[in-house]
Amino acid sequence: MSTYLIGDIHGCYRELRALLTKANFDPTKDTLWLTGDLVARGPDSLKVLRYVKQLGSAARMVLGNHDLHLLGVYAGISRNKPKDKIDTLLSAPDADELINWLRKQPLLQFDDDLKLLMTHAGITPQWDLETAKMCASEVETMFNSSCYPLFLNSMYGDMPNNWSPELSGLARLRFSTNALTRMRYCFPNGQLDMLCKDKPENAPAPLKPWFELERQIPPEYAIVFGHWASLEGQGTPDSFYALDTGCCWGGQLTMLRWEDKQYFTQSSLPAVKQH
């Protein structure tokens, strides 16, 4: 019985299946944790969603910013960008079922026995473990409610970018969503910077990758995240695991078997020619 952790799939269904085959993943006894961004940019978002959904309890995913954007597009709130390649998904006969399943997925996964935490972008250094769990749960509750389109309409925006327990309403939910699904850099005081997307060596001072600031999460917990493909899985301190290695950009899909820390990779496959 193994625990596998896989980076952002972005519609790269063939690479996903090839990677799981390489690792001898068995959904009847193994568990697959996914860092989010199952959809968009790659060619087969529909197949990825269908596959992960049918894994049932063998899959533990978190929502990423591209997954949230899909929810917005489907609700008629966000614009469908051709580069996301989600038209087939939007028009699928089971689109309703898939979207309703997707919006009920969490933003944070944790296992206290394995001492493992996963979110899409990371955990802001301004949060301790209980605050992270609470804030993720608040956003999840909103997405599970009938008024979730109201939040989708207010989700976009970079402010507020500083955590306070006094934050409330949509502003609090927006901060939490940004911290869990979009964050890369912080100022030294932990404030989020939502603009810089460069590699760490090119980032302007005083910005630091969120994982370089002092954390409030207990040190025995590992934090697993995706989102930041330009890291190429490198440069994080001990107990931080960056798993997005840019498969949809011609890089590779990366998976980690937790029990023995063995990595498995699958290079991006050439596009299938349409006849």
Curated annotation (Swiss-Prot):
Keywords: Hydrolase. GO terms for molecular function: bis(5'-nucleosyl)-tetraphosphatase (symmetrical) activity. The keyword Calcium does not apply. Its EC number is 3.6.1.41. The keyword Hydrolase applies. It is an enzyme of class 3 (hydrolase). Gene3D superfamilies: 3.60.21.10. SUPFAM superfamilies: Metallo-dependent phosphatases. Pfam families: Metallophos. Belongs to the Ap4A hydrolase family. NCBIfam families: apaH (TIGR00668), PRK00166.1 (NF001204). Hydrolyzes diadenosine 5',5'''-P1,P4-tetraphosphate to yield ADP. This is Bis(5'-nucleosyl)-tetraphosphatase, symmetrical. It comes from Photorhabdus laumondii subsp. laumondii (strain DSM 15139 / CIP 105565 / TT01).
